[in-house]
Amino acid sequence: MKVFTFKYQKNPVGSAIDEMEHIIHAGLQKIKEDELICDSSEVINKIMSPSRLDLFVAIVERQPNSLYELAQILGKDQSQVLKDAKTLESLGLIELLEVSGEGRAKLKPKALYDKIVFEVEPKQVAKSA
């Protein structure tokens, strides 16, 4: 199961610098492409709005063949579904595949993760407050 994590952490820059120093001194390589660290819960909520979460869930569970089909599943306007899908694609959570067929090419959404996790470390938040 492939998991993407949104991590709420106060002072992520300071933590990232500390982690980078540890990695350099230990000779380790650590790049997490499946994690986004943010110090603002408002930003996380804006990035992963309820509409985008619903869209992600529908893609994982229903595996629609097009954005039109996804819009029908969600009962939403296709232009809004496209906008939200483009945001999820820019985050690396989904990809939009061009599928040719009758008429013009369609965009087929494909989930790149099976699960999204929202992580809060209360001790980290309290420590940096």
Where are the language model's segments positioned?
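Short alpha-helical segments that sit at the start of domains
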Residues: 27-53
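A short, conserved structural fragment
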Residues: 92-99
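Amphipathic alpha-helical dimerization/coiled-coil segments
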Residues: 18-32, 114-129
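Hydrophobic residues on short alpha-helical segments
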Residues: 55-57
